[in-house]
């Protein structure tokens, strides 16, 4: 009797969360992703948004090699979650996660310290591949008047904001292409501030998908209070808003 062997389906979408940073600018005595925001940690909120999305098959978290807090999170044993050891810089952590991701999947790379992510923003990004097959990022048009200074802190000139955007996360690219381009950029000594900058360096120009203004990154102490206000509002409504 012959037997039919089936190959497990490779996930179409994986989320990558670089969480190996120490958050020095917060001066909080612990990595900022573990600071409490409402009922749980910042990282806990971030993981909840990703793990609960039905079109994300796996979430890969890159951790500091001496992280002793992650296993205390309720999400740590989730069946969709995988951890890897991250690197000294964000790009190194993303590279480590990409190396273990399915190479024919797409990766949503999301900051650990952006806890207010909604499913509606994820949905918009996932749906963007028809318009932007090269990949895309969540972003927000600049609203304020932008000034460029000189090196003494004096205004040099006003920048036209008409075509300026704030880059947010997630940033969404094919795993294999992002892995190749990010690795090549780092080997060339290029300073990589986000995944889109690695793709731009390689001659790939990502699309811009307008995201929510409350998808903020907790970087400074004041951000924690603001994120708390946003999270309180989101907690009263579903993530799909």
From Swiss-Prot:
Record GO terms (molecular function): 2-C-methyl-D-erythritol 4-phosphate cytidylyltransferase activity
InterPro entries, per database record: IspD (IPR001228), IspD/TarI (IPR034683), IspD/TarI_cytidylyltransf_bact (IPR050088), Nucleotide-diphossugar_trans (IPR029044)
Top-rank taxon, per record: Bacteria
Keywords recorded for this protein, A-Z: Isoprene biosynthesis, Nucleotidyltransferase, Transferase
Pathway(s) it belongs to: Isoprenoid biosynthesis; isopentenyl diphosphate biosynthesis via DXP pathway; isopentenyl diphosphate from 1-deoxy-D-xylulose 5-phosphate: step 2/6
Sites annotated Transition state stabilizer: 25, 32
Protein's job: Catalyzes the formation of 4-diphosphocytidyl-2-C-methyl-D-erythritol from CTP and 2-C-methyl-D-erythritol 4-phosphate (MEP).
Protein's name in the database: 2-C-methyl-D-erythritol 4-phosphate cytidylyltransferase
Species in which this protein is naturally found: Shewanella denitrificans (strain OS217 / ATCC BAA-1090 / DSM 15013)
Gene that specifies this protein: ispD
